[in-house]
């Protein structure tokens, strides 16, 4: 079957490019359908989470159903549309879907476009060719889009989807439906403003979230009838006419009966009106018709009378004297019981106080005993330390004397060697005098390189105003001692208040000024403790200072924890001053003469 195309000019292009252009040209149509669906996205909600999830899924399905509405169901005067816009196979419109990816007329490379997209898909499942001319067609993607036909469809007149009772049977709602007839490309803007779309009841949605509520979902209604719906909706929120609380209309009777405290009710005894919040106090204290006990019921009167008759009851006869006497006797017994309990409590309290006093005395004795033991232990430790120091000093003195003796022997041997060399040189000069040759003299190394006697240095370094100098030391990291000489070398100490490596420790190092002298130093550094304490901080070491490491300092980077130093109870920081004792044994090394 062939049709004359008359004013239709067929243009071919790749499916991908034309599909992009087609989507842009028909974007309004797709968006308008989405907005129409959004107006109907509120569906039945129940009072539990699972039903809410199910309803959300139903909303999505409803949107997809509306997008699946065939254009042929909405088009106006379908019978007057030219046959060239109908599929030659299914006889439906060539473009029959609002989906953006399906709103197009497709054609083979020879320009045949007489088949709709659905029929093309069914045909290509069986044969890979054009239905009309037989040219090879590999897939839907190999077809091109006919832009002129597609654009023509955007101008077709359609009924508003909201003109029907629903989008399943497509039965016209002549009374309440939308009367607008629009072009397909105007659908989006129209649906944004259309007041005939169906919406779900918001009151039901909110009511379903309340706990322990059972309800029947209101049917969907059109937007423009929302005010009329709220007038009859049982779940609409209203204000209580008595207390002003916001409640659902369906709960009004329950609220008035069980919760509202401002509603007026009648007293069951006197039948006078009172607010519900006042009725209990009225009946308890004021209502003249309420039945109450006699005020002397504790004394034995068991009469039950109206409050208004109480005075009359009390004046009848003299029997209440006995009841009053009974009450007084009961009170006397109660007082006696309380006094007895009070006496027992006082005795118990005195016993506990006595035990507390005994425990305090025992604790003080134990504490004093512990302090005495600690002091004795500290004294013993100090005595042992002093003995050890004396022994070390004696050993050092003996070593010093031995070194001095060795140095004297080496000096004598060196002098003898020099004298012997001088004699030999003298003889050599005499023998070789005729030849006028003078031998060069080379001094040999003296034994062990030679050394001076050992020098001993003892002193104290007092750092006053420690807290102030500590703050000044922040900028240069240390506090420097005055210079002091040992033999021919000059030394000094550096105290690092915040540590050289770790901030929570104080560090101390011994330095030598730079020169060419080589010297071996045995040093002992001790932080003075001004109280009896177990804490002893000292550093001993032996180090050689020479030209290669003359600027290096030797000591301890973790000499004492800063917290221990600043703790007054430890006895190191007294009157904002610390004292450091130093004892140094230095041996200056003499290098051999060379020529």
UniProtKB/Swiss-Prot annotation:
GO terms for cellular component: cytoplasm. Residues 441-450 have a biased composition (Polar residues). Residues 14-64, 409-450 are annotated as: Disordered. One of its GO terms (molecular function) is zinc ion binding. It is found in: Cytoplasm. The keyword Metal-binding applies. Signal peptide: none annotated. A zinc finger (TRAF-type) spans 189-253, 254-311. Disulfide bonds: none annotated. Keywords: Coiled coil, Cytoplasm, Metal-binding, Repeat, Zinc, Zinc-finger. Residues 348-410 form a coiled coil. Residues 17-64, 409-440 have a biased composition (Low complexity). Its main location: cytoplasm. The MATH/TRAF domain binds to receptor cytoplasmic domains. Probable adapter protein and signal transducer that links members of the tumor necrosis factor receptor family to different signaling pathways by association with the receptor cytoplasmic domain and kinases. This is TNF receptor-associated factor family protein DDB_G0272348. It comes from Dictyostelium discoideum (Social amoeba). The lineage of its organism: Eukaryota, Amoebozoa, Evosea, Eumycetozoa, Dictyostelia.
């Amino acid at each position: 079957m062939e049709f004359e195309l008359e004013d239709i000019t067929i243009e071919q292009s790749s499916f991908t490019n034309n599909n992009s252009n087609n989507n842009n040209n028909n974007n309004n149509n797709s968006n308008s359908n989405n907005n129409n669906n959004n107006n109907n996205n509120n569906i039945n909600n129940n009072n539990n989470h699972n039903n809410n999830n199910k309803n959300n899924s139903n909303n999505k399905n409803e949107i997809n159903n509306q997008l699946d509405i065939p254009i042929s169901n909405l088009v106006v005067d379908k019978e007057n549309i030219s046959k060239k816009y109908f599929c030659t196979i299914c006889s439906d419109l060539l473009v029959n879907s609002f989906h953006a990816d399906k709103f197009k007329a497709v054609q083979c490379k020879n320009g045949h476009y007489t088949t709709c997209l659905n029929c093309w898909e069914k045909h290509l499942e069986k044969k890979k060719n054009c239905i009309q001319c037989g040219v090879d067609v590999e897939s839907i993607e190999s077809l091109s889009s006919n832009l002129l036909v597609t654009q023509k469809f955007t101008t077709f007149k359609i009924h508003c989807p909201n003109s029907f009772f629903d989008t399943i049977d497509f039965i016209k709602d002549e009374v309440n439906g939308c009367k607008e007839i629009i072009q397909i490309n105007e659908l989006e803007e129209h649906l944004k403003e259309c007041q005939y779309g169906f919406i779900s009841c918001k009151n039901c949605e909110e009511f379903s979230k309340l706990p322990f509520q059972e309800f029947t979902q209101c049917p969907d209604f059109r937007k423009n009838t929302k005010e009329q719906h709220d007038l009859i909706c049982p779940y609409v929120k209203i204000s209580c006419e008595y207390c002003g609380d916001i409640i659902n209309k369906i709960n009004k009777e329950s609220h008035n009966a069980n919760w509202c405290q401002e509603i007026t009710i009648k007293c069951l005894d006197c039948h006078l009106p009172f607010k519900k919040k006042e009725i209990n106090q009225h009946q308890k204290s004021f209502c003249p018709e309420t039945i109450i006990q006699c005020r002397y019921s504790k004394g034995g009167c068991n009469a039950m009378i109206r409050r208004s008759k109480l005075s009359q009851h009390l004046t009848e006869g003299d029997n209440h004297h006995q009841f009053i006497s009974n009450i007084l006797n009961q009170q006397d017994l109660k007082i006696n019981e309380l006094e007895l309990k009070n006496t027992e409590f006082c005795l118990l309290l005195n016993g506990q106080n006595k035990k507390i006093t005994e425990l305090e005395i025992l604790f003080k004795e134990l504490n004093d005993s512990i302090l005495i033991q600690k002091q004795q232990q500290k004294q013993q430790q100090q005595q042992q330390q002093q003995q050890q120091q004396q022994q070390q000093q004696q050993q050092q003195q003996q070593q010093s004397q031995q070194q001095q003796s060795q140095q004297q022997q080496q000096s004598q041997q060196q002098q003898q060697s020099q004298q012997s060399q001088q004699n030999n040189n003298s003889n050599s000069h005499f023998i070789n005098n005729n030849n006028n040759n003078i031998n060069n003299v080379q001094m040999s190394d003296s034994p062990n390189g030679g050394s001076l006697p050992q020098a001993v240095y003892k002193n104290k370094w007092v750092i006053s105003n420690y807290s102030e100098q500590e703050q000044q030391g922040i900028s240069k990291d240390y506090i420097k001692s005055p210079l002091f000489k040992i033999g021919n070398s000059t030394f000094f100490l550096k105290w690092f208040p915040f540590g050289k490596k770790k901030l929570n420790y104080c560090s101390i190092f011994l330095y030598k000024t730079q020169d060419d002298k080589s010297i071996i130093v045995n040093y002992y550094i001790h932080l003075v403790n001004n109280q009896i304490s177990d804490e002893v901080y000292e550093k001993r070491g032996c180090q050689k200072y020479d030209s290669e490491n003359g600027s290096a300092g030797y000591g301890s980077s973790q000499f004492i924890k800063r917290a221990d130093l600043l703790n007054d109870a430890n006895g190191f920081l007294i009157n904002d001053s610390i004292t450091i004792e130093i004892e140094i044994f230095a041996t200056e090394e003499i290098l051999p003469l060379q020529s």
